[in-house]
UniProtKB/Swiss-Prot annotation:
PROSITE patterns: G_OBG, GTP1_OBG, OBG, OCT
The protein's name in its UniProt record: GTPase Obg
Annotated binding of Mg(2+), by residue: 172, 192
Binding sites annotated in the UniProt record for GTP: 165-172, 190-194, 212-215, 282-285, 310-312
OCT domain boundaries: 350-428
Species of provenance: Bacillus cereus (strain ATCC 14579 / DSM 31 / CCUG 7414 / JCM 2152 / NBRC 15305 / NCIMB 9373 / NCTC 2599 / NRRL B-3711)
Gene name, Swiss-Prot/TrEMBL: obg
Biological role stated in the UniProt entry: An essential GTPase which binds GTP, GDP and possibly (p)ppGpp with moderate affinity, with high nucleotide exchange rates and a fairly low GTP hydrolysis rate. Plays a role in control of the cell cycle, stress response, ribosome biogenesis and in those bacteria that undergo differentiation, in morphogenesis control.
Domain Obg: from-to ranges: 1-158
Classification via InterPro entries: G_OBG, GTP-bd, GTP-bd_Obg/CgtA, GTP-bd_prot_GTP1/OBG_C_sf, GTP1-OBG_CS, GTP1_OBG_dom, GTP1_OBG_dom_sf, OBG_GTPase
GO biological process: ribosome biogenesis
Cellular-component GO terms for this entry: cytoplasm
Named cofactor requirement(s): Mg(2+)
Location, primary (coarse class): cytoplasm
Amino acid sequence: MFVDQVKIYVKGGDGGNGMVAYRREKYVPKGGPAGGDGGKGADVVFVVEEGLRTLMDFRYQRHFKADRGQHGMSKGQHGRKSEDLLVKVPPGTVVKDEKTGQILADLVTHGQTAVIAKGGRGGRGNSRFATATNPAPEIAENGEPGQERDVILELKVLADVGLVGFPSVGKSTLLSVVSSARPKIAEYHFTTIVPNLGVVETGDNRSFVMADLPGLIEGAHAGVGLGHQFLRHIERTRVIVHVIDMSGLEGRDPYEDYVTINNELKEYNLRLTERPQVVVANKMDMPDAEENLQAFKEKVGDEVKIFPISAVTRQGVRDLLFEVANLIETTPEFPIHEVADESDTSVMYKFDTEGVKFEITRESDGTFVISGYDIEKTFKMTDFSRDESVRRFARQMRGMGIDEALRARGAKDGDIVKILEYEFEFID
């Protein structure tokens, strides 16, 4: 089964917890803090594996959770960083954040990697909090939570040339003639329902990859006839070969077919019209084909170069392949997404903290609910089993302006304040 779009969940590993410990060697006067830091959580890393062709494996495993870092230890020993979780994907995979729609990665070459969910940093041990006024702190941090998100994987096949046209115009037959590919061929519409790839070699030893794409119909740009699934595979091609049935056996007008398909390409993605297009008049071995071709030429004018062929008899196929190979050599690749500067790639992993850093709402029972990335992360990294950590968290809340904001909302002594699933009393 050919699977070209899936939704999965990924989570980076949490950082290891820091430790509260002290030196106890008899030859070390007054000891001192010796709690080590936790190790960094593992990242979820996507890596391109050229042997894969579809996203089929993700239908059976949709959750990927990386390991957390090792906890800190006594004697100042830091926890070990966990090994990254490597997830193999086929070439041509585009990774998109489901919530924001942001393109996280466009993976095309074998061995290419991208960090999709970063692991959290390790929590600091008590040796990190020692000061002149507090030489033996009873405080350590929990590890930072790993990044988690739902992502959409889309596979857009890697091909130099894409065959487009209405169903049953002879695209699959043409691919089978010019390459070793063996797509399914039959006398009914939508015989081809998945892209088929074939390596084409010309008479002068040039080669390129050609994709036979499922037939398009009017409204494909809006998803009619699975149009979105079919059109996405055209985006990576450098040259579009537009195959038109000149026989007239389907009862359609070749010129109307030509206009309709080009409109679908334009409506789906305007940049598709920037690619050079080769118009192929197929089925020229049929009785009325020559007459239909002349009428077609009169309507499109001399600006459109047309290659009359018969995929069955191979008439005109050689000249067509030479023209396609020439266009590939002179046509640069078309980036399908805006690629961020390499120095800015870290931006994709950062939470946008501009503006409001927390939000206070009130439930029907009077409970104040505090939410926001910064406060929730700080809450998760606090070890509430230690009084000193609790006091530090209270200072952090004041530093963020939460206490003042609660008073402005009318909070009084004894009111219930909720962060995540935990409740505590507000003390003014």
